[in-house]
């Protein structure tokens, strides 16, 4: 019978480097610590032990929350899942709509090869079983931005099943302990996105934009293995990094390329699961964590007050920080699933099963895609730890910003400075400046080479680290001067002449007899004070370690 | 000239005996003259004349595009035609101008065919009479034939006793039968091409599912729909099929394999073939005339040296009810897009909410047959019913497919069956039963073929005692369309089906008998 017919739709770009990750946008302040900022920030809002923190009253058990997620990721592809219409964010309304997307009668779906490849790669990266044969179904409901009256999805036999996602969570007061956790993945399915409805309440009309209608989505269904907002947010963050690494999705939540629905229930451990609610359309990690934790607390409070939980859909009101029941006029929907008759089963091959006479354009080999998998975030982190002796939390921080790892690696390539020093400069100084001005790595005025040159000067002890900070600030102004130029213009070189330094030390000793007395009395702070005085006299151009050495010799300590 | 076959007129065009414009004008004039048949919903006169003009230029420059260049054709009004109204005979799509051509339409136009117009049908092709469209019923041209007038009872000749064409592609069948075009496209989901072909005395061919693109055909049942071909002889069908068949990147259910040319041998041979006669098709409701013709036809094959055997398709009796479940389920789904928002009818009545708008639009836009099928289909797809109805029907469909697989696997080459239970009936008779009952009766011999995706063809065989056409159906192996048509060509040659004698057309010389086919055939009652 008929073979599946695939269109080619290659991705706009494989790496989403130019996009600014929404969660980094949301972060503010310049308090950049050595660990994952995301986790740190979350800790202030997520209250991870919220539910367990409930002190059990007499005769009561603790509550446990059960959280499952459904994640929709827009596939990064030039064209839509079943039509040749272009995919582009923020194009003029209804400018990217094919006859099929508008559901003109007689039009038929044609599967986009690129979307299938993205789904297989995501399945492989998430340790799923890839189904060699998967099916498409119609899911029916009437909505103004769903022109066909049904969505094509994979309800019966999805492309990938039974995987798992490993993510890390931070424990301890300072979040310095990293523990890995695993959430099972039930399935990954290919489906169509809907259009957008814009309700104009004033004129009581609805405007429909079909640019989004028919864009390929990966629906990733997580088993309910999560227990709080923080876990959910961290798991989604890891998934986001994986999809970005694969080039499967730009996964930018602010642009709606990654959308999360959460299923939440609470129960007493050892007892049956509670009735669950679904919180829909969570479009930032912060709101995801907040909404889940709010909903857990709401359900506990409701149940403890003798109320009951309704199986309902709720939305998160981010202004008020709470979840609200969604108006659902139709009540319970029956989606009347039916096989999509216009698409033959999607058949995938491996190296052993590719038919010899097959048209290569019509064959997708799982083995070939496996060979093409890029390094995944977990492996990258491991490599960073191995290769540079980096702390695990530093490796997380480097991957947490789009483009930061690449920046780091470029600095490493060009500098003689120790990786540890580079890590510190990139994660503290550099990232701190970016955050302060709310810039993406790609928007940085300081290039990797400029930073590398600066670190070389520091490494060769040509300048002090405080002078280096000064130089960095100059570099950040982006006036086109090199680090060496700035150092020489501002006379920031360390005094290399040891005799001159000795004279400076002698003069300071003579000028501050009281401090010298304190030093001799073994006051531990005094020697540092003396070092500071010498440095001041040198206009910060002396190496403190060397000064200390000379002073100690002179005072015969 | 109009009475000729496509192949004959094509060679007349090539030899310059007639120009495309002359031919086009003759057809347009005949369309006007036979307006009372209600075969056409839209006559695309300007488009056709323009196309004829271009065709004429090509002929003058010796750059004819092939056999179809300059040939007037008609297309059922459920195929999308760019810029030409496509209504599906429904209020829902009145005024709808598709922005694109269905692949089959495009392929005809690419070969230089002239599009005369869009033909009438049952609303959204749901029916077996071509009586349930918003533009009124199609009248069978045989009602007005000399043969029928002479042989039928006096009271049957009153104007109110006109005959139906069968359906749902009755407009296309009537258009070909009344010589207003040389080929027409129909669609065939449960018999919608073969049934009216049988009642109107034309060849009606349903290709293998997957051989011809459905892109642009407004669907009834996606998993069974195929574009059908009406012509006045089997060779003409082969010419049209040759143009239409083949992979279409816009229809993922079309096969990738390269299609072989569909030229039929000039002297077809059926000796050595095995012809199966399915015993389940011998039902009590079958008219004795058709039964007798069926048996005579089997004898013809046997006399030619074919092996004729009785075969068993044991699940045939479950077919029609299974078809009903699958058909209505897909209908419910396919009709969901007609909500008045993007295109087509939009109710002006109630704008208080989107839901109210949907309800009013669909209430006004669809007839009761469509609404009834949407309701039953949605019922079958409900979560609580899905396993018991839809899944079960799919399983039965598999059994029916296997019936055919087994028969063809046992060495049978072609099945010979009736196409319809009876000859065409008068409209007044037909509407005594509702659409659902009629469809169940009329699709009895045809819809199982759609469930199995097989090729099948109605070959007009003889006139009944009342002077009305009777057709028999040949069913072939999947994708053995050429073999099927070869057998059909041989059969057609044996039976010598008489040409319709339309009195008013004979009178003005439009139709001069040219090939002696007006003599009675060899299979007469």
Swiss-Prot record, chain B:
Origin, by domain of life?
Eukaryota
Keyword tags: ATP-binding, Ligase, Mitochondrion, Nucleotide-binding, Protein biosynthesis
EC main group: ligase
The record places the active site at: 76, 168, 192
Pfam families, alphabetically?
Answer: Amidase (PF01425)
Give one GO term, molecular function aspect. glutaminyl-tRNA synthase (glutamine-hydrolyzing) activity
Q: What is its EC number?
A: 6.3.5.7
GO cellular component assignments: glutamyl-tRNA(Gln) amidotransferase complex; mitochondrion
Q: Which reaction does it catalyse?
A: L-glutamyl-tRNA(Gln) + L-glutamine + ATP + H2O = L-glutaminyl-tRNA(Gln) + L-glutamate + ADP + phosphate + H(+)
Q: Which InterPro entries match?
A: Amidase, Amidase_dom, AS_sf, GatA
Matches recorded under Gene3D superfamilies: Amidase signature (AS) domain (3.90.1300.10)
Instruction: Provide the protein's localization.
Output: Mitochondrion
Write out the GO biological process terms: glutaminyl-tRNAGln biosynthesis via transamidation; mitochondrial translation; regulation of protein stability
Presence of the UniProt keyword Chloroplast in the record: no
Question: What is stated as this protein's family in its record?
Answer: Belongs to the amidase family. GatA subfamily.
- State the HAMAP family in the record: GatA
Q: What does this protein do?
A: Allows the formation of correctly charged Gln-tRNA(Gln) through the transamidation of misacylated Glu-tRNA(Gln) in the mitochondria. The reaction takes place in the presence of glutamine and ATP through an activated gamma-phospho-Glu-tRNA(Gln).
Assembly and binders: Subunit of the heterotrimeric GatCAB amidotransferase (AdT) complex, composed of A (QRSL1), B (GATB) and C (GATC) subunits.
**Listed name of the protein:** Glutamyl-tRNA(Gln) amidotransferase subunit A, mitochondrial
Q: Tell me the organism.
A: Rattus norvegicus
Lineage in the entry?
Eukaryota, Metazoa, Chordata, Craniata, Vertebrata
Gene from which the chain derives: Qrsl1
């Amino acid at each position: 019978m008929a073979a599946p017919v695939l269109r080619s739709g290659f991705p706009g770009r494989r790496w989403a480097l130019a996009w600014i990750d929404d969660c980094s946008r949301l972060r503010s302040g310049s308090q950049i610590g050595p660990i994952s900022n995301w986790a740190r920030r979350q800790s202030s809002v997520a209250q991870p032990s919220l539910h367990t923190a409930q002190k059990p009253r007499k005769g009561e058990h603790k509550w446990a929350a059960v959280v499952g997620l459904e994640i929709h990721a827009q596939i990064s592809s030039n064209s839509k899942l079943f039509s040749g219409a272009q995919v582009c964010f923020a194009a003029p309304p209804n400018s990217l709509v094919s006859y099929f997307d508008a559901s003109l009668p007689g039009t038929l779906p044609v599967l986009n090869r690129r979307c299938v490849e993205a789904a297989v790669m995501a399945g492989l990266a998430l340790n799923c079983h890839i189904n060699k044969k998967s099916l498409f179904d119609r899911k029916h409901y009437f909505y103004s931005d769903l022109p066909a009256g049904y969505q094509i999805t994979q309800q019966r036999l999805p492309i990938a099943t039974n995987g798992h996602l490993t993510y890390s969570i931070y424990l301890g007061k300072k979040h310095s302990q990293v523990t890995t956790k695993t959430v099972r993945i039930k399935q990954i399915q290919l489906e169509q996105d809907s259009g957008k409805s814009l309700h104009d309440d004033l004129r009581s009309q609805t405007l429909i934009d079909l640019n989004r209608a028919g864009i390929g989505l990966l629906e990733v269904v997580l088993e309910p293995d999560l227990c709080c907002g923080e876990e959910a947010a961290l798991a989604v963050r890891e998934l986001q990094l994986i999809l970005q690494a694969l080039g499967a999705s730009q996964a930018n939540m602010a642009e709606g390329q990654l959308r999360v629905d959460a299923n939440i229930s609470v129960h007493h451990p050892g007892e049956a699961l509670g009735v669950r609610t679904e919180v829909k359309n969570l479009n930032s990690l912060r709101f995801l964590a907040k909404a889940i934790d709010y909903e857990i607390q709401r359900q506990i409070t409701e149940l403890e007050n003798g109320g009951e939980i309704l199986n309902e859909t709720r939305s998160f009101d981010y202004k008020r920080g709470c979840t609200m029941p969604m108006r659902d006029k139709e009540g319970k929907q029956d989606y009347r699933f039916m096989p999509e008759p216009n698409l033959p089963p999607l058949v995938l091959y491996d190296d052993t099963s590719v038919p010899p006479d097959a048209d290569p354009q019509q064959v997708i080999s799982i083995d070939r895609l496996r060979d093409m998998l890029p390094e995944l975030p977990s492996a990258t982190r491991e490599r960073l730890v191995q290769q540079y002796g980096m702390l695990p939390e530093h490796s997380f921080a480097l991957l947490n910003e789009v483009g930061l790892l690449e920046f780091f690696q470029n600095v490493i390539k060009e500098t003689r400075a120790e990786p540890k020093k580079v890590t510190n400069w990139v994660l503290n100084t550099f990232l701190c400046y970016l955050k302060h001005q709310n810039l993406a790595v790609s928007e940085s005025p300081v290039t990797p080479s400029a930073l590398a040159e600066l670190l070389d000067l520091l490494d060769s002890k040509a300048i002090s680290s405080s002078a280096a900070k000064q130089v960095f600030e100059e570099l950040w102004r982006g006036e086109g001067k090199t680090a060496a130029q700035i150092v020489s213009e501002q006379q920031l070189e360390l005094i290399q002449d040891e005799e001159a330094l000795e004279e400076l030390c002698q003069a300071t000793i003579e000028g501050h007899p009281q401090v010298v007395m304190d030093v001799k009395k073994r006051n531990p702070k005094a020697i540092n004070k003396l070092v500071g005085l010498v440095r001041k006299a040198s206009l910060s151009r002396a190496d403190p370690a060397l000064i200390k050495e000379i002073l100690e010799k002179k005072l015969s300590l | 000239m109009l009475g000729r076959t496509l192949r004959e007129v094509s060679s007349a065009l090539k030899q310059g005996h007639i120009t495309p414009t002359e031919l086009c004008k003759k057809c347009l004039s005949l369309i006007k003259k036979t307006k009372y048949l209600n075969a056409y919903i839209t006559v695309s006169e300007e488009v056709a004349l323009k196309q004829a003009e271009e065709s004429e230029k090509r002929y003058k420059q010796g750059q004819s595009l092939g056999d179809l260049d300059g040939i007037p054709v008609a297309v059922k009004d459920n195929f999308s035609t760019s810029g030409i109204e496509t209504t599906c005979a429904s209020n829902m799509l009145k005024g709808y101008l598709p922005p694109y051509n269905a692949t089959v339409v495009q392929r005809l136009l690419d070969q230089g065919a002239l599009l005369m117009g869009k033909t009438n049908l049952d609303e959204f092709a749901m029916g077996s009479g071509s009586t349930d469209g918003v533009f009124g019923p199609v009248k069978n041209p045989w009602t007005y034939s000399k043969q029928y007038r002479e042989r039928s009872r006096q009271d049957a000749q009153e104007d109110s006793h006109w005959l139906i064409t069968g359906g749902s592609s009755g407009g296309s069948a009537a258009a070909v039968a009344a010589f207003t075009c040389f080929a027409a496209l129909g669609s065939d989901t449960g018999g919608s091409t073969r049934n009216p072909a049988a009642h109107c005395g034309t060849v009606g061919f349903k290709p293998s599912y997957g051989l011809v693109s459905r892109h642009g055909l407004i669907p009834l049942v996606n998993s069974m729909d195929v574009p059908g071909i009406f012509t006045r002889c089997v060779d003409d069908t082969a010419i049209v099929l040759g143009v239409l068949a083949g992979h279409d990147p816009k229809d993922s259910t079309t096969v990738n394999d390269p299609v072989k040319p569909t030229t039929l041998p000039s002297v077809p041979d059926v000796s050595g073939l095995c012809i199966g006669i399915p015993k389940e098709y011998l039902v009590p409701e079958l008219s004795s005339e058709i039964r007798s013709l069926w048996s005579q036809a089997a004898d013809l094959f046997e006399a030619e040296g074919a092996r004729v055997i009785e075969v068993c398709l044991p699940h045939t009796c479950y077919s029609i009810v299974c078809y009903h479940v699958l058909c209505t389920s897909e209908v419910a789904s396919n009709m969901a897009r007609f909500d008045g928002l993007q295109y087509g009818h939009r109710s002006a009545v109630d704008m208080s909410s989107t839901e109210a708008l949907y309800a009013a639009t669909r209430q006004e836009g669809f007839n009761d047959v469509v609404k009834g099928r949407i309701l039953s289909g949605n019922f079958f797809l409900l979560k609580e019913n899905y396993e018991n109805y839809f899944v079960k029907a799919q399983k039965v469909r598999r059994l029916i497919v296997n019936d055919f697989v087994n028969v063809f696997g046992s060495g049978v080459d072609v099945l010979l069956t009736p196409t319809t239970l009876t000859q065409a009936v008068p409209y007044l008779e037909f509407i005594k039963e509702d659409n659902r009952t009629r469809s169940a009766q009329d699709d009895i011999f045809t819809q199982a073929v759609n469930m199995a995706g097989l090729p099948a063809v109605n070959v007009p065989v003889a006139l009944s005692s009342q002077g009305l056409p009777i057709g028999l159906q040949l069913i072939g192996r999947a994708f053995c369309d050429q073999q099927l048509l070869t057998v059909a060509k041989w059969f057609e040659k044996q039976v010598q089906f008489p040409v319709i004698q339309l009195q008013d057309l004979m009178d003005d010389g439009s139709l001069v008998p040219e090939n002696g086919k007006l003599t009675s055939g060899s299979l007469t009652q």
